[in-house]
Amino acid sequence: MQPALAPHPSAQDHADQVLHDQLLAAQHQHLTHPQQARPQPPAPQPPHMQPNTPARDQNNIDPAISGATMLTGPPQTPTQPDVTGQETPKTYGKRPLSTSKRAAQNRAAQRAFRQRKEAHIRELEGKVKAYESMGEAIKALQAENYQLREYIINLQSRLLDSQGEVPELPGNIDLSQPRSEIPVPPIPNSGTATTTAPPPTAPQQPQPSHAQAPTSNDDMNSLNRIAVAGLGMRKPPTEEANYLGNNFQAQARRVRPDEGQPEASELPKQEQTHGLPLIS
């Protein structure tokens, strides 16, 4: 039989080198990551995997190295999560998601803005239509107001004409008695004896006091014509012509008082031809 061979010295050197490298790696990891938790010690190797080294070889190992190795054990590199590999898909997945969400929010905001704008435009259009209708109503009221003003002015002029004061007749004059010198009004073409007074003008302002004399004379002439028409009396053509001339002059003075005509006080007194006595 051949004797058992002793272990080769290169195996011992290899084990020492491995332990030394593991110790240096553990120290470097501890310095670079002080806050990181200490990794769990590895499971003990089965006895058949351990090298068959005698006690004398183990005693030759540096005690500092052997103590650190026994305390820390063979370090294992902690499995750190692949930050780049995991964050890249998240970032790539979040960006399209956030962009699509932002786009949806922008579309919703634009839609709400368009709705508010359309509602505001409709409200303004309604106000414009209301203002236009109010303007038409105001114009109609103004036109009606002008018409009513003209109507009121016309009524006032007629009221002044109808309420003109007629002077009282003297006590010694009786219009019911026939007189030969009473003028006879002109007979119209239709053959009737009734005549109408000329249409009165529509004065906007009351006439002065000095212009009341021709008006009172005209009123007297109107009363005389009514009385004569009721009695059916006639006069010669000469007296009728004189009466017509005097009546035309009185009307001309009343219608055009401001066209260079003298006032009533400056006109020469003319003898009345109505047949009534003059009272001074």
From Swiss-Prot:
Residues 39-49, 197-206 have a biased composition (Pro residues). It is found in: Nucleus. Residues 1-102, 169-280 are annotated as: Disordered. Residues 97-120 are annotated as: Basic motif. GO terms for molecular function: DNA-binding transcription activator activity, RNA polymerase II-specific; transcription cis-regulatory region binding. Residues 96-159 form the bZIP domain. Residues 79-89 have a biased composition (Polar residues). Gene3D superfamilies: 1.20.5.170. PROSITE patterns: BZIP_BASIC. Its main location: nucleus. One of its GO terms (cellular component) is RNA polymerase II transcription regulator complex. PANTHER family: TRANSCRIPTION FACTOR KAPC-RELATED. Putative transcription factor. Belongs to the bZIP family. This is Putative transcription factor kapC. It comes from Aspergillus fumigatus (strain ATCC MYA-4609 / CBS 101355 / FGSC A1100 / Af293) (Neosartorya fumigata). The gene is kapC.
